[in-house]
Swiss-Prot record:
UniProt function note: Regulates arginine biosynthesis genes.
Gene responsible for this protein: argR
Protein name: Arginine repressor
BP terms from Gene Ontology: L-arginine biosynthetic process; protein complex oligomerization; regulation of arginine biosynthetic process
Domain of life according to the entry: Bacteria
Length: 153
């Protein structure tokens, strides 16, 4: 959920000028996210969003530093293009990828630092992700399924 929410935040601030955390919170709620101002504040900090001046005051933007915007967009693109399917049992998630893609996808998962994914092991076309606690597995699978949906690029 966190990754999907943060990807949505990036989309929102790329599409319109958002001046306050409250405005961002309301926009996320309108898109189906159950968020609080504190959650949005943490996301802003993790995404390293900055406030830039505009004609009406200030609005949130991604920093020009490489890595922040690109890493989320890259992860979404790689997952859209490489992940074929996934399944889980207990605290283990199996992610099927195109041949040769598993290492790249596993590396992106590891770099995203999901607090509930404690590690990944990648073969040529299969990734094993270990989740803790096991109750988090269905939510992570749901996030991946959302990321697998092709966007309108």
């Amino acid at each position: 959920m966190k990754l999907r929410r943060q990807l949505c935040i990036i989309d929102i601030i790329n599409q319109k000028e958002v001046a306050t955390q409250e405005e961002l919170c309301e926009t996320l709620k309108n898109q189906g996210f159950d968020v609080t101002q504190a959650t949005v504040s943490r996301d802003i900090k993790e995404l390293k969003l900055i406030k830039v001046a505009d004609k009406d005051g200030y609005h949130y933007a991604l920093p020009d530093t490489p890595g922040v915007k690109g890493s989320f967009e890259r992860m979404k693109r790689v997952i859209e293009d490489s992940v074929l399917g996934l399944d889980y049992s207990e605290n283990l998630i199996i992610i099927k990828t195109l041949p040769g893609s598993a290492h790249a996808v596993a590396s992106l998962i590891d770099s995203a630092e999901w607090p509930t994914i404690i590690g990944t092991v990648a073969g040529d076309d299969t990734i094993l992700a270990v989740v803790k606690p096991k109750e988090a597995a269905p939510g992570i699978v749901e996030e991946f399924e959302q990321l697998m949906l092709k966007s309108n690029r």
